[in-house]
Amino acid sequence: MDKIIIRGARENNLKNINIDLPKNKLIVMTGVSGSGKSSLAFDTIYAEGQRRYVESLSSYARQFLGGSEKPDVDLIEGLSPAISIDQKTTNRNPRSTVGTVTEIYDYLRLLFARVGVPYCPTHHIPITSQSIEEMTNKIMNFDEGTKIMVLSPIVEGEKGTHVDTFNKLRKDGYSRVRVNGEIYDLNEEITLEKNIKDNIDVVVDRLIIKDGIRSRLYESLETSTKLSGGKVVISVVGGEEIIFSENFSCPHCNYSLRELEPRIFSFNAPYGACPYCKGLGFKQKMDVDLVIPDKTKSLNNGAILPFKNMEDTNIYIQKLEIFCDKYKIDMNKPIEKLTKKELNLVLYGSNDAIRFKFKSKGGNAYDKIEIYEGVICLLERRYKETNSSFIRDWLEGYMIDQECEHCHGARLNDSVLNIFINGKNIYDVCNLSIKKCLDFMNKLKLTKEQAKISEVVLKDIKDRLSFLNNVGLEYLTLNRSAATLSGGESQRIRLATQIGSRLTGILYVLDEPSIGLHQRDNQRLINSMLEMRDLGNTLIVVEHDHDTMKQADYLVDIGPLQGVHGGEVVAAGTPEEVMNNENSLTGRYLSGKERIEVPKKRRKGNGLYLEVKGAKENNLKNINVKFPLGKFICVTGVSGSGKSTLVNEILSKTVRNKLYKSKEKPGKCKEVKGIENLDKLVCITQDPIGKTPRSNPATYTGVFDDIREVFAVTKEAKIRGYDKGRFSFNVKGGRCEACSGDGVKRIEMHFLPDVYVPCEVCKGTRYNSETREIKYKGKNISEVLDMTVEDAYVFFENIPKVKSKLEVLKDVGLGYMKLGQSAPTLSGGEASRVKLAKELQKKPTGKSLFILDEPTTGLHTHDVKKLLEILNRIVDNGDTIIVIEHNLDVVAQADHIIDLGPEGGDLGGEVIFTGTPEKIVQDEKSYTGMYLKDVL
C-alpha cells in the first residue's frame, strides 16, 4: 500500500476528517494554533501506530506499558511502525549529556578501550605491556653494529646498603651491576650510604646487534624479566635507554592499570566515575552570595538569610553570639566591613572547643562544650540529615552546582583521564564542539593495526557527528548536559540519532523541528529530513516554517481557524496547489498574497539605556551591549551565538537581583548600568508553568479564582453553605480525596518517568459528587475546567472579570486551550503565552522590561501577526521589550536589533551589528541581515 488512509478522524476538535497521505514522502501539516494539526498527527496517526505496536506485544510486556486507548477514528490503513520526536521529552537527568543521548559516547568508550594509550600520571610515559618476542623484534630492528647492554632493574629508589642483594648476585654468577648509573664489578667491594635512595641494575648481557644473536638476546631478556619481575632496560652504548615491561604498568613507578575495557570510561559506573562527585562533574555546595545576599547588612541585622526561616534559629543565633564574642567579631558591623578571617570564622567555624551556655526560646537550659561548625557547614549538615523534602527543597535554594575540585568537571577518575588518543583523553574529545570533534576524528593518526581495529567504530562516530553537524548543532559539545538544551535542540539531537540508526519503512512524526534554528541552518535541517525520506521512511512534520512547507512533497492545511472553528482539512496537495487555494490561510501567506506588514517608521525610545559591560559568560567575548529603553528590541544570531547567555543569564538575572533581591547568580560581566530606570521585570520563558497536574492555565492566570466566586454565589451553593474554597481542588472539602484533587494518580516507575493514570473514583474530574451537583448555566465546575478558552469566553460573557482575563488568553492565540489542561502537557510555546497572558492583565507602568525567549514557538504566521499586535501595544505604553527570536517577521518589526555571532559556540559571542532592520540588511557580515532582505 502506497498511502496512509484515514477515515472519520474525530479526536479532540477534528470534524470527521477523511484524508489519504502518500507514504515515503515528506508531509507537512500546518494551520493556526489549535486548528487540530497535532490532534491529527500525534493524537490520531502516531497514537494508533503506537497502540498497534503495544497490542502486538505479549500480555507480560503490556502490563508495564499500560493500556493505550484507541483514538477516535473509524479507520486507519497503511500505517508503518511509528516513532514520535516531540519537544516535551527532554531528559532532565544530570547524568545525560549530548554524547550519551546520541550514543556517540558509547562508541567513544569503545574506541578508547581498543586504541587508547594509557600514560603514567607521574612520569607521563606510555604504559604498555610487551611480550619477550615483541621486545626481541624491536631490538633486532636496531642498526647493525649497535652495542647494547641488557639490564635488569632489581632495586628502584630504595634506601639501604644492599649488601645481601650484592651477595646473592655473586652467588648466582653475575659479574657486573650498574649502581646509580655507574658500572661496578661484583668482585670488588661496593659500599653504599644507608640513608640514600639507590637504583641497582644487573648487567645480564652485553651484545652487538648482528645476525645470529637473536636466540641469545631472547634468553637474556627472559633472564632479565625473571630477575626484575617483568622489566628490562636496554642501554645503547653512547645513546639512549629504552625501558620495556612485560606488565601493564609504568616501568619507573609500577603504576598499573586494569585492562582497558569500555566500562572504565563510563562516568555512570564505579570503575570510571570520579570517586568524589560520583561522576556528576559537580557537587552541590552552599553559596556564600546566596546565604548572605546583602553584604551591607550586619549579622544582627539579618545578613544570614536562611536564619530568618529556620527552626531552632534561636539556638543557632545564640551560639553565633557567643562565638563572635570569643573571637571579638562585631555583630553590628556590615558584612562587607568584616575582615576575610572574621567572615571565614563565621561561615566555616573554628576547631576550638567553646562552652555554649544559654536558655532557648522554650526556656530550656543549654550548656555544652563543643566546636562551632560555622553557618555554611551547619546548612550543609542540615541538608544531608533532613528527611523533609520541603526543607531539602528550601535549602537547595541557597546552593549552587560547583565544579568538582578533583576531576574539574571531567566526571572521570584520574587513571581514565590519563588514557590518550593523539594527545587527547575522552574528556578532551567530548569538550570539542561537534564540528571540531568531527575534524579531530577525520585527522586521527593511527597505526595500521589500530586503524583496522577501529575502522567500524570510527565510521559510526563520524556518521553520527556528521548528522548532528547537518541539523545545525555543530556548536554543541558532547559534554553539554541534556537538561540545558532547548526543545528545538533536543528534538534535532533525537532526529540526528534516528538518521544515524538508518531505519527504513518507519513513520516519523515530528513537532516543529525548526524551533530555535536560524534561517542560515534551516536548509541543512530540511536536507536531513529529505535524507530520512530517501531511506524509505514517511515523515509527518507539524511545522509553520515557510521554507519547510515549500519543500514538502505534500502539504496539509488544517483549519480554517482554531478550536471548534477548526478541525477540517482546508487544503491538501503539493505546496503549489495549496498556495493556489483561496480558502487556505496558509496558502495565502506562503504565496505572499497576505503578509505581516513592516512598520513604516521605527520608535525613537525614551533616550534611556540598559547597558551590559564586559559580558564574558560561556562564549561571550567580553562584549559591551546597550539596550535602548522604550523600544521593541530583537536579539538575533545563529544558534549558539550567545543570545540566551546575554539576555537570560546576564541581563535578566542581574536586573532581577537588583529589583527583587532574588537569589539567582547572574552570568559573568563587569556591570549592568541603567537598572534604576526600571520598576518591573517580566520574563516570559518556555519553562513549564508548573510541574504537576495541579497547575493549569486557569489557576496560573488567576481566572479560576473568579470562576470559583461565580459558583459560590449560585443559589444552590448558598443553600448548602458552600463558599469559594469549596470549588478549589487544592484543599479538602470539595475535592476528590481519592486523588487529592489531582484528577490523576501518579505511579512511580523508578527508572522510568512517572506515569499518571486517571483517578477511578472521580474519573478525572478532580471533585467529589456533591461539589459536582452545583451548576451554573447547566455546567458544573469540572465541566467548566474542561471547556476551551473560546467556549468559556462565550459562556461567561456576562461576567466582566472572567471575560476580560479569558479575552487576553484568546488574544495570545490560546483560544483552543482547555482551562484545566495540566501544566506538564503544555508545549514550551504554549507555556510562554500563558505567562504573557497573565502579565497582560496588569496595568502598564511605562518602566517595565519584558524579556521573551522565542515567543513565536508553535505559532502560525497568522498567530504571529496577532502576537505582534499585543507586543507593539506593550511598547506603545512606554514599556521595553527584548525578544530572542529567529522569526524574520518578528525581527522586521523591531525598532532595534542586536545581532550576535558570527557563528555558534567558540566562534560566536561577538556583537556583529546593532541598529535598525533597514541598516542590518546593508551589513555583509550579518547572516540575519542577509535573510531579512527578502522580508523588508
Descriptions of predicted regions:
Residues 1-936:
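Conserved phosphate-binding elements of NTP-dependent enzyme cores
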